[in-house]
A protein has these predicted regions:
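Acidic/polar N-terminal loop/beta-strand segments that form early-domain functional surfaces
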Residues: 26, 60, 133
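SH3/SH3-like (including bacterial SH3b) beta-barrel domains
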Residues: 25-50
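Catalytic-site microenvironment of enzymes
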Residues: 1-19, 43-44, 50-51, 67, ...
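SH3/SH3-like beta-barrel fold
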Residues: 42, 55-59
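Short, compositionally biased
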Residues: 58-69
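Short, flexible active-site loop motifs that bind/organize anionic cofactors or intermediates
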Residues: 32, 61, 175
Length: 340
């Protein structure tokens, strides 16, 4: 049910840490279908109603809704930004908002993602969440619920089938040459960020350093609310240098009928297939048919197109030239998915 609004009439401003916040046509954060626009820090709005968690405002002649956490009656200061790469400035931290759908399931949530804005001449007006897998200190000492409805996992993986809880963030594997997976996923994320920024995409770096205190649920919920899609970067734990693939949504009726999977699984699989095609076009070796069915915490809580892409395994080369090749393939996949 829609919240009850107390009628008001005043001027308010959007207050963010420099990033943008979504305004919606309804008070529902479980879908991105109702997003009208992403509005930036200090945007002036006319407020017509207030409720406990939402404000009703006028934006470009439309009545829209914005989370009250991002509204202030005083003109906010512009945040200090630092040049993040030759193509963007760090535009602000995005933290987990407790009012966002599924946020309460997160256990490790004090960290922040970092939003980078493209300064390319042709902007795509899309935010890509790039999630460098693993890299949360203490992530294995905490467990989170596998599914929002409390049901058990339908496939194996880091956590076996039948489990209802899983480690909040696993440590990941170690490459055959002794390098930690979390180190390589971060290096890959930085390469991908720069290539996406150059191509006109804004990038939400879920993990922008060695450690981020955000578990897999927090990472997914932040991406749900601050990005147009969510790409988690991983390498598999096998040792055969088998190639890249994406984790597809298992073809299990009970799982596909559980929300939010039910409303979004086709988007997840379509994004994964596009990324694999992009990698293939860049000359990257692809494993089998390019996908492997897996019940993941990420997929179980995602309300935007979301995928875990495995870019190889323990035996794979992870030199800078290989990361560049992988980055080119992933960008091609993103462009294809969005038809850009």
């Amino acid at each position: 049910p829609a919240p009850e609004f107390k009628a008001v009439s005043d001027t308010v401003y959007v207050k963010t840490n420099g990033g943008s916040v979504r305004v919606r046509s309804s008070c529902d954060t479980s879908t991105s279908d109702n997003v009208v626009a992403n509005v930036g820090n200090a945007t002036e709005l006319t407020r017509t109603g207030t409720s406990e968690k939402w404000d009703r405002v006028e934006y470009e002649g439309k009545t829209v809704y914005i989370s009250s956490d991002f509204v202030t009656t005083e003109v906010p200061k512009e945040p200090e930004t630092s040049a993040a790469s030759s193509n963007a400035a760090a535009d602000g931290h995005v933290t987990l908002n407790h009012s966002w759908k599924y946020a309460d399931f997160a256990k490790i949530k004090s960290g922040a993602a970092v939003l980078y804005r493209s300064t390319a001449s042709e902007k795509k007006n899309k935010v890509i969440a790039v999630n460098a897998g693993h890299g949360t200190k203490g992530g294995t000492s905490v467990k989170t619920q596998c599914h929002p409805d409390g049901t058990a996992k339908v496939t194996g993986g880091t956590t076996g089938a039948g489990a209802t809880s899983a480690v909040a963030v696993s440590t990941g594997m170690t490459f055959s040459d002794g390098t930690a997976e979390s180190k390589v996923t971060l290096a890959m994320a930085k390469v991908l960020k720069d290539k996406l920024l150059s191509a006109g995409y804004d990038v939400l770096m879920i993990r922008d350093g060695e450690d981020v205190q955000l578990d897999n649920i927090a990472r997914s919920v932040i991406a749900n609310n601050a990005a147009d899609c969510h790409i988690a970067l991983h390498w598999d734990s096998t040792t055969s240098n088998k190639g890249a693939f994406y984790m597809s949504v298992p073809d299990v009726a009970s799982y596909k009928n559980m929300e939010p999977v039910k409303s979004h699984w086709q988007q997840h699989n379509a994004l994964g297939a596009s990324l694999v095609e992009g990698l293939k076009s860049a000359g990257v070796k692809i494993f089998s048919g390019g996908s492997m069915a897996m019940d993941l915490t990420q997929t179980s809580y995602s309300t935007v197109p979301s995928v875990d892409i495995e870019l190889g395994d323990k035996a794979s080369d992870h030199s800078q030239s290989t990361l560049n090749q992988l980055g080119d393939g992933l960008v091609a996949g993103v462009k294809a998915y969005f038809g850009q």
